[in-house]
């Protein structure tokens, strides 16, 4: 699975309810479900940096396998990026991607994000160390 380890696996209805309740406190909203043809297809959200990094937000998203290959993630990232720059005093949005997740790298590039850095041996997942690719979209740079 391409999600971070703190993401519940399997993801239960209890987990979904907790996520919805947790997100009610944000105004403006920071996290959204991704809907496609009336069905939950995934989720997208961002977390603001703290202190000196408060002009940054880290983007995260997922789309369920039945919805892959339909352009849903790319469209969601584009719309969400515009929303974040409109609603928040943010200068940059970045996303970190495991080296084995080429699909997410493609989504980010199609949505206008550019490769910014490779964090060599930047993560460990399922006992394997790998590189972490960082993509960025900077306000006003297209």
Describe these PLM feature segments.
Residues 1-21:
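Conserved GNAT-fold acetyl-CoA-binding loop/helix
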Residues 8-10, 28, 74:
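Proline-rich low-complexity regions
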């Amino acid at each position: 699975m391409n999600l971070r380890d703190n993401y519940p696996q399997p993801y239960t209805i209890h987990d979904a309810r907790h996520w919805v309740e947790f997100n009610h406190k944000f105004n403006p909203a920071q996290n959204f479900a991704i809907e496609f043809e009336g069905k939950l297809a995934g989720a997208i959200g961002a977390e603001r940096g703290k202190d000196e990094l408060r002009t940054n937000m880290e983007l995260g998203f997922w789309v369920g396998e039945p919805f892959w290959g339909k352009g849903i993630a790319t469209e969601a990232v584009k719309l969400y990026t515009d929303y974040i720059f409109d609603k928040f005093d943010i200068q940059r949005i970045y996303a970190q991607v495991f080296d084995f997740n080429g699909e997410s790298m493609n989504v980010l590039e199609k949505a206008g994000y550019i490769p910014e850095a490779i964090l060599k041996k930047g993560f460990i997942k399922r006992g394997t160390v790998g590189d972490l690719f960082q993509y960025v979209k900077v306000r006003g740079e297209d």
